[in-house]
Structures are given as structure tokens and as C-alpha cells.
Design a protein with these regions (language model features):
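Short linear sequence motif anchored by a di-proline
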Residues: 1-153
Length: 153
């Protein structure tokens, strides 16, 4: 399984929730190939400089594992082999995350897993909610010595 979707003219790690059904890049996967990406935390770097950016770890208050909303697809590589790929769905950030990054992963509630996976004529857009700040713990870890690419997106 590879992280990110590869298209003829584009590569993307994540999928924006806004417009997910309007874009031919993600529409079919959202309608037919929803998945979860288990995690116990995720990391973001607050981009202030080309390097030495503050690193944050984000968990849920219980510190239990949680499920990031995802979609998957099959990509045909140059050798002609089909490879499974996955992309995490992101939303606009809540007020706390907006201080660090302009997007945040969609976290699904356990009570919503069955609906997320259920085949449906109407994909569950309402589950792509912005997780409120009180449902996240954001902890500054360190300034991370990482050189950012000049054309990073």
C-alpha cells in the first residue's frame, strides 16, 4: 500500500473534503472505496522557516487509537503492475489547528464506522466534519531540523 494518489499530471498525499464529489480525481474512490487509516497520533510542522520548524503531535484526549477518514485506489505503475494507494481526507482546520496548518485530517467517530463503510447511493459527506479543538490534544515536541523543498505544496 502506497501513501498518496498518483494521477497523470499530479501526485497528492491527501484529499480535500471540500469538493470531493466534484473532482473526477477523487469522486469514484469516495463513492466506492472508503477506508480508515488507523492512527494513535499525527504530526504537523508549523512552517515558519525553511528549516527548524516547530513539530507538533496531535492525539485525541483519551490517547487511544483513532480512525482517519481515507479513500483508496489502484494505480498502474510503469511496470504495468497495479498497486493499492491510500489518501487521507482533510478538512478546513479548527481554530487550534489553524495556528499550525491550513488543513487537518478528518477523524471518524467509532459510532460512524458502519455508515462510513456501508455502500450507499449517497456518500456520507456529513461525516467529513471539522474536528473541534476540544477533541484534540496538540503538543509542541521540538523544532525539527528539516530542510523543506523549494516547491513544497
Amino acid at each position: 500500500m502506497y501513501w498518496g494518489f498518483t494521477f497523470p499530471q499530479r501526485f497528492t498525499f491527501n484529499t480535500r473534503s471540500d469538493g470531493i464529489l466534484k473532482s473526477g480525481l477523487w469522486k469514484t474512490s469516495f463513492e466506492e472505496r472508503r477506508c480508515i487509516v488507523p492512527a494513535d497520533s499525527f504530526f504537523e510542522w508549523k512552517r515558519l522557516h525553511k528549516k527548524n520548524n516547530p513539530k507538533y503531535e496531535i492525539t485525541i484526549p483519551s490517547r487511544e487509537p483513532f480512525a482517519l477518514a481515507g479513500i483508496w485506489s489502484m494505480w498502474k505503475n510503469k511496470a504495468g503492475d497495479y498497486v493499492p494507494t491510500v489518501s487521507v481526507i482533510t478538512s478546513e482546520p479548527n481554530e487550534a489547528m489553524a495556528e499550525i496548518h491550513n488543513r487537518q485530517p478528518v477523524i471518524l467517530e467509532p459510532r460512524d464506522y458502519a455508515e462510513w463503510f456501508a455502500p450507499s447511493a449517497r456518500p456520507p459527506l456529513h461525516l467529513l466534519r471539522i474536528v473541534p479543538p476540544e477533541e484534540m490534544n496538540i503538543q509542541l515536541l521540538e523544532a525539527h531540523n528539516m530542510q523543506l523543498p523549494l516547491n513544497s505544496a
